[in-house]
Each structure stands twice: as structure tokens, then as C-alpha cells.
A protein has these predicted regions:
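Terminal helix-turn-helix DNA-binding modules in bacterial transcription factors
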Residues: 71-111, 133-138
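Receiver (REC) domain switch/output surface
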Residues: 1-5
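Intrinsically disordered or compositionally simple regulatory linkers and C-terminal tails
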Residues: 10-25
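Short, Lys/Arg-enriched anionic-surface-contact patches
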Residues: 23-33, 75-84
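Recognition helices and adjacent regulatory flanks at domain boundaries
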Residues: 29, 37-41, 64, 118, ...
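Basic, amphipathic alpha-helical hairpins
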Residues: 37-49, 69, 73, 90-99, ...
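C-terminal end segment of the histidine kinase catalytic
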Residues: 6-10, 138
Length: 138
């Protein structure tokens, strides 16, 4: 059971879509994750968006948010924010070839394109440019 949970968390983390159904096995967790995801997506271009703002918008204690997200996703709140930013970037790279890397970096809340590229490569093991070429050829 624990191994299945870990596999699902890894699958959620690695796939480019945001699909909370993979992670949740009850309606309360699904609603919780939908709300967290919605808040992060609404603030995705906000460079200053932080865990503190997520906590305030969720209306729960920081430790409660941390514990619940860690249990469901296997990630800390800041890691989840980064994961969702990078998933959006992957989507934009695939579906918006007219946007350059700097524009995608801005639209996903990164202050600097170089930092965005570094984070993207760490997550997907390929640069944003290479990911775009790979995805467009498919």
C-alpha cells in the first residue's frame, strides 16, 4: 500500500499534466487538492507567491498544510508550488510555440529565465528548448 502511494506520488510529480485524481482516494482529499491547485494556478505568474500566501488563502495552519500535502503528494508546499509551475511551463512549451523561454518563465512566476531553465532541467532532465523540440516532433 505504501509502495503504491509512493509510485502514485512519483507519477503525479513527473507527468506534465496536473491530475489530482492520481493522488486522492477520498472526496475530502480531492477537494483539498483541487483548492490548493486552483490557488497556485491563479497565482502562477506571481513571482512573490509563497507558502505563506497559500496558507492564508487556504485558511489553515502552516503545519497542517505541510502535513496534509506531504501525506497526499509526498511534497512540501514549496515543492508543490514549483511542481505546478513547471507543469504549466511544460504545457506552454508544448502548446504555445510562439512564446519564447523568457515569456514562459514570466508566465510561470520565475524571476529569471536562467533559473527557470535550471529548475526545468532538474525536473524533466532536459532543457526547455529540447523539451519543446521533443514535444513538437511527437
Amino acid at each position: 500500500l505504501v509502495n503504491n502511494r509512493i509510485m502514485l506520488q512519483e507519477k503525479f510529480s513527473k507527468q506534465p499534466q496536473i491530475n489530482t485524481l492520481i493522488l486522492t482516494n477520498n472526496i475530502l482529499d480531492k477537494k483539498f487538492m483541487d483548492k490548493v491547485t486552483e490557488i497556485i494556478e491563479n497565482e502562477i505568474d506571481n513571482v512573490n507567491f509563497s507558502v505563506d500566501q497559500l496558507v492564508a488563502q487556504m485558511g489553515i495552519a502552516r503545519t497542517k498544510l505541510f502535513t496534509k500535502l506531504k501525506a497526499i503528494t509526498g511534497q512540501t508546499p514549496s515543492d508543490l508550488i514549483m511542481t505546478i509551475r513547471l507543469k504549466r511551463a511544460a504545457y506552454l512549451l508544448k502548446n504555445n510555440p510562439e512564446l519564447n523561454i523568457s515569456e514562459i518563465s514570466d508566465r510561470t512566476g520565475f524571476s529569471f529565465p536562467k533559473y527557470f531553465s535550471k529548475c526545468f532541467k532538474k525536473k524533466y532532465h532536459v532543457t526547455p528548448q529540447a523539451y519543446r523540440k521533443e514535444e513538437i516532433q511527437i
